Amino acid sequence: MHPNTVADAPNINVGGLASLDNRIAILAGEGILPLAVARRLTERGRAPLVITLRSDADVFRDIADPLIRMRYPRLTKAVCEMRKHGVQSVIMAGRVPKKIIYIPALFDPLMLRYLNRISHDDHSLLAAVVDIIESNGISVLPYRHILPELVAPEGQLGHRPPTEKEERDFQYGASVLKVILPCSFGQALVVADGAVVAVEAIEGTDSMIERAGKLVSKGVLVKMMRSDQDLRYDLPTVGPKTIENMTQSGLTCLAVESRRTLIVETEKVLDLARRSDIAIWGLPCQCQ
């Protein structure tokens, strides 16, 4: 047995599961992305099994078959449920509450074995989850191929192009991110008047935007992907809340990495940006 295989998962009689071919599950984190994925799968004719820690799990009620709520991140139980329901593939979508990484009492023994030997950041945690899932014969699927229309293109995305000043600021911000991203932090930052005002750490982009708004009354937000992030489940994501927070903090331009950033609820994002006169720009992809 693989050292990360869930030993107490029930044995499934696959002979009686022909109707469950290509059954897909979603490990649903926070945010609207897992909802979008679940809706799309349901539209394609088969509602996914949804496993989530979310307190608002009922939002999946009509687009999950079945919906499994969990109070704590028990990966053993999640794998058992997927195997019990004949799941062959899983999609991991949504934000992971980063604070749980520092509360080991929440995890089951399977995850604790990993936590004791990996870096305590969300990317390492997600990679460990993927390793365990795949060792149990369940493949991890990319969600960007299910929702290709959400992938940010290059160039102007909103109602107006950036000003020369905004472009100088986001080009500078992108050059800074290229330096700090290999250090496993700083997926996003805010630049105002050629100076870095705030850099994202474990608090997340939204909190970083709020922090920047307390320091300056203007600026641009730049968001890019780390080279060690997995394109299947760890793409940077922006959505309506991003624009709302930018508006509250006085930021006037959003620059994201094209092809490696998702814009969730795109039409709403563009409408909010237009109302607040926020420019949105797709930076050239840093794909290797």
Residue ranges and their predicted role:
Residues S19-R23, R44-A47, H85-Q88, N136-I138, ...:
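Short coil/turn connectors at secondary-structure junctions
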Residues I26-A28, V50-I51, V90-A93, D122, ...:
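General beta-strand structural signal in soluble alpha/beta enzymes
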Residues L53-H85, I103-Y114, S207-Q288:
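Feature captures the catalytic cores and cofactor-binding loops of soluble hydro-lyases/lyases
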